[in-house]
Amino acid sequence: MQAYAVRDAAAVPARLSGFELVEGRVAETATVRKRTYLNFGADWRSDFTVSLAPKARKLFEAEGIDPLSYRGKLVRVRGWLKSYNGPLIEATHPEQIEVIEE
């Protein structure tokens, strides 16, 4: 089924919406105004991004995961895709992000 296919983070259409599985290498990580971002391309304004609110970040930390440590890793992300400075998934729980390759 194409609807459940894993999408390449570099090729996710900006206007796509719905529940998606997206896989790619995290190019950069940053925390800005208490929100953490995992950027998958050179331009965060247009490339795929995962966002973690402060409440979600606390859940990751409770599991012993520093979200900033995803930098450089190949990951698969599950969640509702929306358009905000390019395609974005807001991760609310650590189980949404699976490390495929260190």
Please report, for each region that a protein language model flagged, where it lies by residue:
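OB-fold single-stranded nucleic acid-binding module
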Residues: 1-102
